[in-house]
Amino acid sequence: MLGALADGRDLSAADTAWAMNEIMSDNATSAQIAAFGVAIKIKGPTPEELGGLATGMFEHARLVSIDGDAVDIVGTGGDRSGSVNISTMSSIVVAAAGVPVVKHGNRAASSKSGGADVLEALGVRLNLGPEAVARCVREVGIGFCFAPVFHPALRFAGAARREIGIPTVFNILGPLTNPARPRAGLVGCAFPELLEVVAGVFAERGASALVVRGADGLDEITTSDVTDTWVVSGGRMRRTTIDPTRLGIARVDLDALRGGDAEVNAGVARSVFAGTAGAVRDAVLVNSAAAIVAYDLSRGVGDPDADVHDALAAGMARAAAAIDGGQAAALLERWAKLSNTLGDR
């Protein structure tokens, strides 16, 4: 298998699922794991290969069973922008707007504050098990799957990943392996060469997603430039561009979206939920809107071939109402309170 990758040959989904099973069963050496992760990244993974790797991870995961549809708002990370936690804030706003959210995430790897870090600073308990996460979704409208809790066998790849210290195929798998397997997603990808490939995974699953990368490198919908976007629905993919100026958002310098550590970013989140206007609120509104669009598409609502700006404008209005009506701040308070009463089941 390593020889095939070294020769630039693609693997089947069955091949990569087998390889991931070997890794997560602790049957592979650190050298083999490192070589595999780097080789497939250098070759360039296919949707089939990524889908197989995700399948292998799901076979070892603690899965979450939820009632009905939900959306995830997640990114690969690795954009090194130092931005505030836009996807985390957007997740809370989307849930407050009435759309069920199951977010999958982890602590920061290459930044000062990951999604898990800022949620913890906001008072949300991280180490909840499948039943507790499902209860949060059922009672509050949002749950968080902390990756180490739900993918414990991934620890067997940890040493190899730390030793080589460069992005590998494992960096791409987080957005593809939400343990609740929601049918919709807003997915940011920091790697431009993989944007279409990641979209292809969702297309093969029959899921609905907006897969995005800002022209400034942000693994979110940016407001400093346009955003390269793949709209995925019903097994089909369409490429488009999101321009914030068409949504009434003035372009800003990327510095306006930069944050700090978890406590700083938690303070920014509280400020946004309190109704503070500005660049961060605008970014949260447009990303929240995109998640709402993806969720609607998963339920057969909306036209995936229509100009995405029209649907985004409607979604932004819903998101703004959830903030300005106090629902986002109230939901965060309820979520934090409930999560701290639950165990790790």
From Swiss-Prot:
GO terms for biological process: L-tryptophan biosynthetic process. Coiled coil: none annotated. Its cofactor is Mg(2+). The keyword Magnesium applies. It is an enzyme of class 2 (transferase). Anthranilate 1 binds at G75, N106. It comes from the Bacteria. Mg(2+) 1 binds at S87, E220. Anthranilate 2 binds at R161. Pathway: Amino-acid biosynthesis; L-tryptophan biosynthesis; L-tryptophan from chorismate: step 2/5. Mg(2+) 2 binds at D219, E220. One of its GO terms (cellular component) is cytosol. Its EC number is 2.4.2.18. 5-phospho-alpha-D-ribose 1-diphosphate binds at residues 75, 78-79, 83, 85-88, 103-111, 115. Binds 2 magnesium ions per monomer. It catalyses: N-(5-phospho-beta-D-ribosyl)anthranilate + diphosphate = 5-phospho-alpha-D-ribose 1-diphosphate + anthranilate. GO terms for molecular function: anthranilate phosphoribosyltransferase activity; magnesium ion binding. Keywords: Amino-acid biosynthesis, Aromatic amino acid biosynthesis, Glycosyltransferase, Magnesium, Metal-binding, Transferase, Tryptophan biosynthesis. Belongs to the anthranilate phosphoribosyltransferase family. Catalyzes the transfer of the phosphoribosyl group of 5-phosphorylribose-1-pyrophosphate (PRPP) to anthranilate to yield N-(5'-phosphoribosyl)-anthranilate (PRA). Homodimer. This is Anthranilate phosphoribosyltransferase. The gene is trpD.
